[in-house]
Amino acid sequence: MKKGIHPEYIPCKVTCVTSGKEIEVLSTKPEMRIDISSFCHPFYTGSDKIADTAGRVEKFKQRYNLK
């Protein structure tokens, strides 16, 4: 690698806003905040949330008096 052209990598504290967990990685920034991570994403946790679309449709129809 050429000297003097690559950024300096420093320890970076990455904080997941949703779960509040922190991990440390190497980056060019000292700190990052992310909305979702493998600690709280349904794919990784196995806790899928199934949307009750039928209930939502019925609620919508009731609200606007639709048949």
Swiss-Prot record:
The record's keywords, sorted A to Z, are:
Ribonucleoprotein, Ribosomal protein, RNA-binding, rRNA-binding
Q: Which superkingdom, per the lineage? A: Bacteria
Single GO molecular function: rRNA binding
Q: Which family does it belong to?
A: Belongs to the bacterial ribosomal protein bL31 family. Type A subfamily.
Q: How does it assemble?
A: Part of the 50S ribosomal subunit.
What is the protein's given name?
Answer: Large ribosomal subunit protein bL31
GO terms under biological process? translation
